[in-house]
Swiss-Prot record:
Keywords assigned: Hydrolase, Metal-binding, Pyrimidine biosynthesis, Zinc
Keyword Zinc included in the entry's annotation: yes
Residues the record lists as N6-carboxylysine modifications: K100
Binding of Zn(2+) 2, residues: K100, H137, H175
Catalytic activity: (S)-dihydroorotate + H2O = N-carbamoyl-L-aspartate + H(+)
Lineage of the organism: Bacteria, Pseudomonadati, Pseudomonadota, Gammaproteobacteria, Pseudomonadales
Residues annotated to bind substrate: H16, L17, R18, N42, H137, L220, H252, A264
Known partners and oligomeric status: Homodimer.
Protein name stated in the entry: Dihydroorotase
Lineage top rank: taxon: Bacteria
The keyword Membrane is assigned to this record: no
Record InterPro entries: Amidohydro-rel, DHOdimr, Dihydroorotase_CS, Metal_Hydrolase
GO biological process assignments: 'de novo' pyrimidine nucleobase biosynthetic process; 'de novo' UMP biosynthetic process; pyrimidine nucleotide biosynthetic process
Record pathway: Pyrimidine metabolism; UMP biosynthesis via de novo pathway; (S)-dihydroorotate from bicarbonate: step 3/3
Length: 348
């Protein structure tokens, strides 16, 4: 068993960097490992057009560490009123790489999202024409649907219909959490892919709920039972190019997580590739990590693969109990615990 693992530099195809003072922390954590990242647009107000995407992009670039070449790939936030002209302008910009479907009320800052899928069909047609991928938070939001069933329900009610109606539209089913989603993606045409988070590979709902409620495991879509966790691991290590890395690293200040009504999201960017390495090692599949982390994503998006490399070493280290997050602090995934892999920093 090797104690070193060298990969083409990976990318993160789903990250939340937040905004304002927090960028000084989140951008550096992402840039430490990733060459590029698909940056989620659910700010307040959301990133709805190319001009807003460019302004956000400039704020991210200004927060990059010195000499960093980290590239933010911007995303539009779809609303019921997103026009075909906005889609075409965004595509022509060269820096907007996708548009995101948030069902209204599904997750953090999704209140401006889509109320009926049919309301964005003209926008989706334009996206298919210009070659802009659709990113999907795949959960229904009706109050009567159990929170653990919302992903499967979304597939049956909406996603199958979208994929069938727009056969040339690239669709990324983001942060999948169920065996149902993995099976859907495997059986779908080649234009449908999926991201998988490290926390959904490493944990299930027992980790969040048994022995006390652990708010730093709370995310949306919520952690599912262990059989779904195993199905996600099967997909991730399969070598199937439809599945690729997307951390869904989503920081919230400690007081917003450790609360009577805590926010959803896990902060993993600070040690993302190390966490994925642990998950792949559980399956004796470290040889499949480079494909999942560094190859499948750019290939799906039609972007060049990175050419530089990173190296992980088998070395135990203790994750910090907290990290700075603007004017507050954030408790990262695995806070205070031992990690088994460590990114070898440049010059080390």
């Amino acid at each position: 068993m090797s104690d070193r693992l060298t990969l083409l530099r990976p990318d993160d195809w789903h990250i939340h960097l937040r905004d304002g003072a927090a960028l000084a922390n989140t951008v550096g954590d992402a840039a430490r490992t990733f060459g590029r990242a698909i940056v989620m647009p659910n700010l307040v107000p959301p990133v709805r057009n190319a001009a807003e995407a460019d302004a956000y992009r400039q704020r991210i670039l200004a927060a990059r560490p010195a000499a960093s070449r980290f590239e933010p790939l911007m995303v539009l936030y779809l609303t019921d009123r997103t026009s075909t002209e906005e889609i075409r302008t965004a595509k022509a910009s060269g820096f907007v790489h996708a548009a995101k479907l948030y069902p209204a009320g599904a997750t953090t800052n999704s209140d401006s999202g889509v109320t009926r899928i049919d309301n964005i069909f003209e926008a989706l047609e334009a996206m298919a024409e210009v070659g802009m991928p659709l990113l999907v938070h795949g959960e229904v939001t009706r109050a009567e649907v159990d929170v653990f069933d919302r992903e499967k329900q979304f597939i049956d009610e909406h996603l199958r219909r979208v994929v069938e109606r727009f056969p040339t539209l690239k669709v990324v089913f983001e942060h999948i959490t169920t065996g149902d989603a993995a099976q859907f993606v495997r059986e779908a045409p080649a234009n449908v892919g999926a991201t998988i988070t490290a926390h959904h590979l490493l944990y299930n709902r027992n980790h969040m709920l048994v022995g006390g409620i652990r708010p730093h495991f709370y995310c949306l879509p919520i952690l599912k039972r262990n059989t779904h966790q195993e199905a996600l691991l099967d997909a991730a290590v399969s070598g199937n190019p439809k599945f690729f890395l997307g951390t869904d690293s989503a920081p919230h200040a400690r007081h917003a997580k450790e609360a009577a009504c805590g926010c959803a999201g896990c902060y993993s960017a600070y040690a993302a590739i190390e966490l994925y390495a642990e998950a792949f090692e559980q399956r004796n599949a470290l040889d499949k990590l480079e494909g999942f982390a560094s190859l499948h994503g750019p290939d799906f998006y039609g972007l060049p693969r990175n050419t530089d490399r990173i190296t992980l070493v088998r070395e135990e280290w203790q994750a910090p109990a907290s990290l700075p997050f603007g004017d507050f602090d954030v408790v990262p995934l695995r806070a205070g615990e031992t990690l088994r892999w460590k990114l070898l920093e440049a010059g080390a």
